[in-house]
Amino acid sequence: MAVPKKRTSKSKRKIRKTVWREKANKAAKKAFSLARLILSGRSKSFCYTVNNKSSESSESTSIDESDDS
């Protein structure tokens, strides 16, 4: 037969929640730092691909418009 577990104290709950928040803050800080590094253009060890599809399509439409003029 199933027996209900003992209730977790407020202090344990608070400690666990604090640990969880600290982990989340650390991950967010790391991601933000990486994003700043990529956007600054000074990254030498981090490789990533740039998606230029949207810029190519906008350039082609602007070129087409200038040809008509």
Swiss-Prot record:
Keywords attached to this Swiss-Prot or TrEMBL record, sorted alphabetically, are: Chloroplast, Plastid, Ribonucleoprotein, Ribosomal protein
Q: What PANTHER family would the database entry show?
A: 50S RIBOSOMAL PROTEIN L32, CHLOROPLASTIC, LARGE RIBOSOMAL SUBUNIT PROTEIN BL32C
**An example Gene Ontology biological process:** translation
Concerning SUPFAM superfamilies, the annotation shows: Zn-binding ribosomal proteins (SSF57829)
Similarity field: Belongs to the bacterial ribosomal protein bL32 family.
MF terms from GO for this chain are: structural constituent of ribosome
Highest rank taxon of the organism: Eukaryota
This chain's protein is named Large ribosomal subunit protein bL32c
Compartment annotation: Plastid, Chloroplast
Family annotation (InterPro entries): Ribosomal_bL32 (IPR002677), Ribosomal_bL32_plant/cyanobact (IPR044958), Ribosomal_zn-bd (IPR011332)
Q: Which organism is it from?
A: Anthoceros angustus (Hornwort)
Kindly list the organism's lineage: Eukaryota, Viridiplantae, Streptophyta, Embryophyta, Anthocerotophyta
- Mind telling me which GO cellular component terms the entry cites? chloroplast; large ribosomal subunit
